């Protein structure tokens, strides 16, 4: 089953170098940490927000560039054993769009149901 969510906001914390993509009106149930990428799960077992710690190093960008995110998308594939996360982001750097990607894999330690989910943000 494929579920799509449109997040409406993002916050970049320059000092702590973390990005938080959010905006869903779902009710929060729990979080899972995939080695510094935190997925917030709603009561419906769908991903409702993503926080990326140490973001500038993970995306190989300057911190200043992360203040100019123009597009973000994430594909989350949940299997019985694992959660695989594939992210793409575009930032405006010197009046030019620069595309970056990031993948993460972790255990499905909270037994989320098998699904494929997508999150997208246009700024």
Curated annotation (Swiss-Prot):
Keywords: Purine salvage, Transferase. GO terms for molecular function: transferase activity. Transmembrane segments: none annotated. May play a role in purine salvage. It holds the Pfam family DUF2283. Disruption phenotype: Cells have increased resistance to the purine analog 8-aza-2,6-diaminopurine (8-ADP). It is an enzyme of class 2 (transferase). The keyword Transferase applies. One of its GO terms (biological process) is purine ribonucleoside salvage. This is Putative hypoxanthine phosphoribosyltransferase. Its EC number is 2.-.-.-. InterPro entries: DUF2283 (IPR019270).
